[in-house]
UniProtKB/Swiss-Prot annotation:
HAMAP family: Glu_tRNA_synth_type1
Purpose of the protein: Catalyzes the attachment of glutamate to tRNA(Glu) in a two-step reaction: glutamate is first activated by ATP to form Glu-AMP and then transferred to the acceptor end of tRNA(Glu).
Localization of this protein: Cytoplasm
Locus of motif 'KMSKS' region: 256-260
Molecular functions (GO terms): ATP binding; glutamate-tRNA ligase activity; tRNA binding; zinc ion binding
Family: Belongs to the class-I aminoacyl-tRNA synthetase family. Glutamate--tRNA ligase type 1 subfamily.
EC number, as in UniProt: 6.1.1.17
Underlying gene: gltX
Complex and partners: Monomer.
Organism expressing this protein natively: Mycobacteroides abscessus (strain ATCC 19977 / DSM 44196 / CCUG 20993 / CIP 104536 / JCM 13569 / NCTC 13031 / TMC 1543 / L948)
InterPro entries xref list: aa-tRNA-synth_I_cd-bd, aa-tRNA-synth_I_codon-bd_sub2, aa_tRNA-synth_I_cd-bd_sf, Glu-tRNA-ligase_bac/mito, Glu-tRNA-synth_I_codon-bd_sub1, Glu/Gln-tRNA-synth, Glu/Gln-tRNA-synth_Ib_cat-dom, Glu_tRNA_lig_a-bdl
Alphabetical UniProt keywords: Aminoacyl-tRNA synthetase, ATP-binding, Cytoplasm, Ligase, Nucleotide-binding, Protein biosynthesis
Protein name per UniProt: Glutamate--tRNA ligase
Binding-site residues for ATP, renumbered to this chain: K259
Highest rank taxon of the organism: Bacteria
Amino acid sequence: MSNTKIRVRFCPSPTGTPHVGLIRTALFNWAYARHCGGDFVFRIEDTDAGRDSEESYLAILDALRWLGLDWDEGPEVGGPYEPYRQSQRKELHREVVRKLLEAGEAYEAFSTAEEVEARHLAAGRNPKLGYDNYDRDLTEEQRAAFRAEGRDPVVRLRMPDHDITWNDLVRGETTFAAGVVPDFALTRGNGDPLYTLVNPVDDALMKITHVLRGEDLLPSTPRQIALYEAMIRIGVTDSIPAFAHLPSVLGEGTKKLSKRDPQSNLFLHRDRGFIPEGLLNYLALLGWSIADDHDIFSLAEMVTAFDVTDVNSNPARFDQKKADAINAEHIRLLAPEEFVTRLRTYFAAHGHELGLDESAFAVAADLVQTRIVVLGDAWGLLKFLNDDAYAIDPGAARKELGEASLPVLDAAIGALESLEAWTTPAIEGALKSALIEGLELKPRKAFGPLRVAVTGATVSPPLFESMELLGSGRTLTRLRNARSWENGVGDQTDSG
């Protein structure tokens, strides 16, 4: 396989909302393909008509595109092994089943679940042991008798009588002893192929060389290797792919992150204002690291460094605080003009309007780029620029406004009313002269009431720049209105 082009696949089922574990798997496959100069194949496993949905399929496409994980073959782009939706490949799967039956690699099984349990009980075994390989050696007469009863057989693969061992690229040598895995079903009674068949068959037909997937699928690997061995013997494929089982992603405590956990929902992170660079960087750290002292890296740097053999086999815990911190770093790394574009797009998607022209919006964006963790934080800092969204927080008012603030507000109003140029340096100079020098106040005492009056909060972008953006009229109106704040009640409107 060393001279063969690396081909990996990402094959989600279109059910529910894309979750971070699924996307981590996609990322590791994508990065390995790009690192090796190979192909990233995207295949949809839509074999469960009762659970699959077009909405979920479109959500997966949306997720991959938003993150920039492009695929070389698959839905929307095509490729040499079309179709890439398993529901459209049934005839290919049935043909492999036919060949397996003809070669004696598989057989028809008529036993019901109740009959299997009864045989286990009669032999003093646990009735929940699973299939007992009873139908392996049925005679043609016995099969005919079952058909005469109206029974529809499933097709089962004959498991080998030897140990199944593979060198897992993450976990090392892994062995399942002979006899541990019973003969397993490849089809339903109506002949429809099952996931246990279609997944490895499609991997074989699409010449997948490496299977990178979650460790929850490790128990199915001996079955798949046995099926591969059978497919080699009947000429469907000529090799078995390398397997790498990625570590579980844990949530709180030692519990595996569930699809029901909010932090597992990819789109909730996007809605909060994660940017692709930040989220991908964090997901990469769930089982892999680029260096012991280097947690912040780009996707290009990951591609250069990524080798699946470096993935850690220990479970990885999803730490929201660390994810947030990494996202904040990537927001800071954006070029200013790129940050403006991202923030404007985010605000538009969430119905946030500041009422600023392009140049003023760029100034506002610059004020918050180093002060936010996710894009959503920017609205909380900048919404004071929208008169409809502006409101004085009662807690902030109780802390900073009231009778003691009146001299400060009056001095500020007097200093600002006489300004000829409404610029940040002029505003800063006038206020420092009036409050720091004139009233001999410390900066916090001088500017705390002004910040709450102008922005409605104790935490805001830089005060003087905020006043310039707000404009002289609205700034002075808010300062005047703040004088009337008594006992948590005051005029918060901008109409004088």
